[in-house]
Amino acid sequence: MKKMITMIVCSISFLVLSACVSKKKLILPESEKISVISLQKKLSEDVKTINKREEISKLIEEIQKQSKSTSLESVNDQPTNVKDYIIIKFYHQNEEKDSVVYLYTKKKRQYIEQPYAGIWEVNPDIANRIEEVFLVDL
């Protein structure tokens, strides 16, 4: 009987702790505070910029809506063990420090990595849309 009660208590404790795992939320700057978003491929000198207010708002909103939390952690300034990535830099209007996230594909899945904050899986549509920016002149 004592073993049974111990097993039940342990099981309930495990379930409670498992349910308390928080989902990290990707926190991007507010679109009103951004003057420009720059997009640059890792090994390229080619930098594309987005400076239209509605495009900035739309991109930030889409990334936030379509990002799913993962258990992966970001422990470096830039993604590691990734062949190629896109640097997405948010230039703030009234602040010296800019925000940056990285978009990359790993094992046929697309991720956004925010240095030291976390890694989120994103919908392939977002990745494709950002990739298309490099195919057209803005």
Regions found by a protein language model. Name each.
Residues 21-23:
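Bacterial signal peptide processing site
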Residues 40-74:
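Post-signal-peptide N-terminal segment of Sec-exported extracytoplasmic proteins
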Residues 1-5:
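Positively charged n-region of N-terminal signal peptides that target proteins for export
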Residues 29-45:
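Post-signal peptide N-terminal segment of mature Sec-exported envelope proteins
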Residues 69-109:
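Short, structured surface segments that line ligand/substrate-binding pockets
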Residues 114-138:
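C-terminal partner/receptor-binding element of secreted or periplasmic proteins
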Residues 16-19:
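C-terminal motif of bacterial Sec signal peptides marking the signal peptidase cleavage site
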